[in-house]
Amino acid sequence: MKCPYCGARDARVIDSRELNGGESIRRRRECIACGRRFTTYERVEPIWLMVVKRDGRREPFDVGKLREGLRLALKKRPVSPDEIDRIVATVERELQSLGTSEVPSTLIGEIVLRELKQLDDVAYIRFASVYRRFADLEDLRREMEALGWRPRAAVTVDETS
Protein backbone atom coordinates (compact mmCIF):
# COMPACT_ATOMS: atom_id res chain seq x y z
CA MET A 1 0.00 0.00 0.00
CA LYS A 2 1.43 3.35 -1.04
CA CYS A 3 1.90 5.90 1.78
CA PRO A 4 -0.29 8.99 1.15
CA TYR A 5 2.37 11.21 2.79
CA CYS A 6 5.71 10.17 1.30
CA GLY A 7 4.71 7.79 -1.50
CA ALA A 8 6.75 4.86 -0.15
CA ARG A 9 5.37 1.44 -1.01
CA ASP A 10 6.07 -0.30 2.30
CA ALA A 11 3.66 -0.03 5.22
CA ARG A 12 2.83 -2.39 8.02
CA VAL A 13 -0.61 -3.11 9.42
CA ILE A 14 -0.97 -2.00 13.05
CA ASP A 15 -4.63 -2.83 13.62
CA SER A 16 -7.48 -4.49 11.68
CA ARG A 17 -11.17 -4.37 12.56
CA GLU A 18 -14.26 -5.72 10.87
CA LEU A 19 -17.02 -3.24 10.08
CA ASN A 20 -20.67 -3.67 9.10
CA GLY A 21 -20.88 -7.24 10.32
CA GLY A 22 -17.81 -8.36 8.39
CA GLU A 23 -18.78 -6.60 5.15
CA SER A 24 -15.63 -4.47 5.26
CA ILE A 25 -12.32 -4.19 7.12
CA ARG A 26 -10.68 -1.06 8.52
CA ARG A 27 -6.87 -1.22 8.75
CA ARG A 28 -4.53 1.20 10.51
CA ARG A 29 -1.17 1.22 8.78
CA GLU A 30 2.23 2.74 9.52
CA CYS A 31 4.64 3.74 6.76
CA ILE A 32 8.04 2.06 7.14
CA ALA A 33 9.82 5.02 5.49
CA CYS A 34 8.30 8.08 7.23
CA GLY A 35 6.58 6.52 10.26
CA ARG A 36 3.24 8.28 9.66
CA ARG A 37 -0.01 6.43 10.13
CA PHE A 38 -3.01 6.21 7.84
CA THR A 39 -6.24 4.25 7.54
CA THR A 40 -7.43 2.06 4.69
CA TYR A 41 -10.73 0.27 4.13
CA GLU A 42 -11.27 -2.99 2.28
CA ARG A 43 -14.52 -4.47 1.01
CA VAL A 44 -15.52 -7.02 -1.54
CA GLU A 45 -16.30 -5.37 -4.84
CA PRO A 46 -19.95 -6.00 -5.59
CA ILE A 47 -20.81 -7.95 -8.68
CA TRP A 48 -22.88 -6.14 -11.28
CA LEU A 49 -26.36 -7.58 -11.25
CA MET A 50 -29.10 -7.01 -13.76
CA VAL A 51 -32.66 -7.24 -12.47
CA VAL A 52 -35.16 -8.84 -14.81
CA LYS A 53 -38.48 -7.04 -14.29
CA ARG A 54 -41.89 -8.72 -14.61
CA ASP A 55 -42.36 -7.25 -18.08
CA GLY A 56 -38.98 -8.58 -19.25
CA ARG A 57 -37.08 -5.29 -19.06
CA ARG A 58 -33.61 -5.41 -17.54
CA GLU A 59 -32.09 -2.75 -15.32
CA PRO A 60 -29.04 -2.62 -13.06
CA PHE A 61 -29.59 -3.64 -9.45
CA ASP A 62 -30.02 -0.42 -7.48
CA VAL A 63 -29.38 -0.70 -3.75
CA GLY A 64 -30.79 2.81 -3.32
CA LYS A 65 -34.12 1.68 -4.76
CA LEU A 66 -34.14 -1.30 -2.40
CA ARG A 67 -33.34 0.93 0.59
CA GLU A 68 -36.08 3.42 -0.38
CA GLY A 69 -38.67 0.64 -0.65
CA LEU A 70 -37.72 -0.58 2.81
CA ARG A 71 -37.77 2.96 4.19
CA LEU A 72 -41.31 3.49 2.91
CA ALA A 73 -42.53 0.15 4.27
CA LEU A 74 -40.94 0.88 7.65
CA LYS A 75 -42.00 4.54 7.86
CA LYS A 76 -43.09 5.43 11.42
CA ARG A 77 -42.39 1.87 12.61
CA PRO A 78 -40.18 1.16 15.64
CA VAL A 79 -37.30 -0.17 13.53
CA SER A 80 -33.74 1.18 13.61
CA PRO A 81 -31.75 2.21 10.53
CA ASP A 82 -29.37 -0.63 11.44
CA GLU A 83 -32.17 -3.11 10.75
CA ILE A 84 -32.69 -1.60 7.30
CA ASP A 85 -28.94 -1.92 6.67
CA ARG A 86 -29.09 -5.55 7.84
CA ILE A 87 -31.90 -6.37 5.41
CA VAL A 88 -30.11 -4.63 2.52
CA ALA A 89 -26.91 -6.58 3.32
CA THR A 90 -28.89 -9.84 3.49
CA VAL A 91 -30.49 -9.21 0.09
CA GLU A 92 -27.14 -8.29 -1.49
CA ARG A 93 -25.40 -11.31 0.05
CA GLU A 94 -28.10 -13.73 -1.13
CA LEU A 95 -28.13 -12.30 -4.65
CA GLN A 96 -24.34 -12.43 -4.91
CA SER A 97 -24.28 -16.02 -3.63
CA LEU A 98 -26.35 -17.05 -6.67
CA GLY A 99 -23.34 -16.43 -8.88
CA THR A 100 -25.46 -15.21 -11.78
CA SER A 101 -25.44 -11.89 -13.55
CA GLU A 102 -29.25 -11.64 -13.79
CA VAL A 103 -31.87 -12.06 -11.09
CA PRO A 104 -35.64 -11.83 -11.35
CA SER A 105 -37.22 -8.93 -9.48
CA THR A 106 -39.60 -11.46 -7.93
CA LEU A 107 -36.70 -13.11 -6.10
CA ILE A 108 -35.63 -9.78 -4.60
CA GLY A 109 -39.22 -9.12 -3.51
CA GLU A 110 -39.53 -12.54 -1.87
CA ILE A 111 -36.28 -12.09 0.08
CA VAL A 112 -37.45 -8.67 1.30
CA LEU A 113 -40.85 -10.08 2.30
CA ARG A 114 -39.21 -12.92 4.23
CA GLU A 115 -37.03 -10.46 6.15
CA LEU A 116 -39.89 -8.02 6.84
CA LYS A 117 -42.15 -10.85 8.01
CA GLN A 118 -39.63 -11.64 10.75
CA LEU A 119 -39.20 -7.97 11.64
CA ASP A 120 -42.52 -6.12 11.50
CA ASP A 121 -46.00 -7.26 10.39
CA VAL A 122 -47.17 -3.77 9.40
CA ALA A 123 -44.12 -3.18 7.21
CA TYR A 124 -44.60 -6.63 5.71
CA ILE A 125 -48.21 -5.82 4.74
CA ARG A 126 -47.21 -2.42 3.35
CA PHE A 127 -44.49 -3.93 1.17
CA ALA A 128 -46.63 -6.92 0.15
CA SER A 129 -49.52 -4.68 -0.90
CA VAL A 130 -47.30 -3.01 -3.49
CA TYR A 131 -45.15 -6.01 -4.43
CA ARG A 132 -48.09 -8.42 -4.78
CA ARG A 133 -50.30 -5.73 -6.30
CA PHE A 134 -53.30 -6.12 -4.01
CA ALA A 135 -56.37 -5.30 -6.07
CA ASP A 136 -58.83 -4.94 -3.21
CA LEU A 137 -59.42 -5.38 0.51
CA GLU A 138 -60.02 -9.10 0.03
CA ASP A 139 -56.40 -9.51 -1.12
CA LEU A 140 -55.28 -7.58 1.96
CA ARG A 141 -57.47 -9.68 4.29
CA ARG A 142 -56.09 -12.94 2.86
CA GLU A 143 -52.50 -11.76 3.37
CA MET A 144 -53.24 -10.63 6.93
CA GLU A 145 -54.89 -13.98 7.72
CA ALA A 146 -51.79 -15.73 6.41
CA LEU A 147 -49.87 -13.78 9.08
CA GLY A 148 -52.23 -15.11 11.75
CA TRP A 149 -54.57 -12.11 11.97
CA ARG A 150 -58.19 -12.87 12.78
CA PRO A 151 -60.96 -10.27 12.54
CA ARG A 152 -62.53 -9.26 15.83
CA ALA A 153 -66.21 -9.78 16.40
CA ALA A 154 -68.27 -6.80 15.36
CA VAL A 155 -69.20 -4.46 18.19
CA THR A 156 -72.85 -3.50 18.30
CA VAL A 157 -74.09 -0.25 19.72
CA ASP A 158 -77.34 -0.16 21.64
CA GLU A 159 -79.25 2.74 20.11
CA THR A 160 -81.94 2.78 22.83
CA SER A 161 -79.66 4.29 25.46
Swiss-Prot record:
InterPro entries in the cross-refs: ATP-cone_dom (IPR005144), NrdR-like_N (IPR055173), RNR_NrdR-like (IPR003796)
Family listed: Belongs to the NrdR family.
Zinc finger (unnamed): 3-34
Domain of life: Bacteria
Cofactor requirement: Zn(2+)
Listed GO biological process terms: negative regulation of DNA-templated transcription
Entry note: cofactor: Binds 1 zinc ion.
ATP-cone domain span: 49-139
Protein name: Transcriptional repressor NrdR
Keyword DNA-binding attached: yes
Role noted for this protein: Negatively regulates transcription of bacterial ribonucleotide reductase nrd genes and operons by binding to NrdR-boxes.
Keyword vocabulary terms for this entry: ATP-binding, DNA-binding, Metal-binding, Nucleotide-binding, Repressor, Transcription, Transcription regulation, Zinc, Zinc-finger
UniProt key word Repeat: no
Molecular function in Gene Ontology: ATP binding; DNA binding; zinc ion binding
